[in-house]
Amino acid sequence: MITGKTKLLGVIGHPVEHSLSPVMHNAAIAQLGLDYVYLPFPIAPDNLEAAIALLATIGVVGFSVTIPHKQAIIPLLAEISPVAQAIGAVNTVTRQNNQWVGTNTDIEGFIAPLQTTYKRDWSQQIAVILGNGGAARAVVAGCYQLGFAEIHVVGRNVQRLEEFRHSWDNSPIAENLQVHTWDYLAKLVPQANLLVNTTPIGMYPQVDESPLSTEELANLQTGAIAYDLIYIPKPTQFLQKAQQQGAIAIDGLEMLVQQGVAALKIWLQQDDIPVDVMRQALQKHLGLV
């Protein structure tokens, strides 16, 4: 039951009505028996500064940040973590010492399955990343953290690819990072130990689309990991095609759950988060069980 003592968490975005975050966070809060509630806050870009001041005034403990605010919120925060600085985006904000502090848990979300269920020695391995937008930044940083020998980012716009590459110039990641246009994929796919889709191609409602065709995936190594950040539909065409070549498939639902787990650890200041409950709540909500 919500009372005057209930502590507030939430997610800000525009739109935010379809966010899955309240489903999994409230399931975890209920399982833990805590007097918290996690709410969606639809906030238009023009209202962002006023909105986060208001969230402070009403005592919000912390909040998630989604599109289109992940970059725009940075100058409005008192402090951001080195991880958020490197990625250039914030997805988790916490109230500390009467100030807003931002970080990014997308890296933790992305690498979690690669450190647990699918753990291997990545130091001699090659990662190929499709897309060079905001999501790709977290994936690049995650691959570097895992120790990949080579990280290849593939995009369609030469100018944006160069901007992406130069944005890492002051980071040790630059040594491992190469960028390529889409026509180079025929050479990269056979080398890939990890192939990640960070593009929206294949996301609902365009469920019949894939960033790569069956022919382009034909030379993917058996046992390579295909990882799609999309979680609706499940599985995507990209993952279905990769599995037909003998690849191991990971979808975006696990990343969503694990970045949420990392955020709850920060807000609740405890390590014991019921990840299975969060995963099951999402699967049930999406009609996957």
From Swiss-Prot:
One of its GO terms (biological process) is shikimate metabolic process. GO terms for cellular component: cytosol. It holds the Pfam family SDH_C. Shikimate binds at S19, L20, S21, T66, N91, D106, Y231. The active site is at K70. Its EC number is 1.1.1.25. Keywords: Amino-acid biosynthesis, Aromatic amino acid biosynthesis, NADP, Oxidoreductase. Gene3D superfamilies: Leucine Dehydrogenase, chain A, domain 1, NAD(P)-binding Rossmann-like Domain. Pathway: Metabolic intermediate biosynthesis; chorismate biosynthesis; chorismate from D-erythrose 4-phosphate and phosphoenolpyruvate: step 4/7. GO terms for molecular function: NADP binding; shikimate 3-dehydrogenase (NADP+) activity. InterPro entries: Aminoacid_DH-like_N_sf, NAD(P)-bd_dom_sf, SDH_C, Shikimate_DH, Shikimate_DH-bd_N, Shikimate_DH_fam. It comes from the Bacteria. NADP(+) binds at G131, N132, G133, G134, A135, L229, G252. It catalyses: shikimate + NADP(+) = 3-dehydroshikimate + NADPH + H(+). HAMAP family: Shikimate_DH_AroE. Homodimer. Involved in the biosynthesis of the chorismate, which leads to the biosynthesis of aromatic amino acids. Catalyzes the reversible NADPH linked reduction of 3-dehydroshikimate (DHSA) to yield shikimate (SA). Belongs to the shikimate dehydrogenase family. This is Shikimate dehydrogenase (NADP(+)). It comes from Trichormus variabilis (strain ATCC 29413 / PCC 7937) (Anabaena variabilis). The gene is aroE.
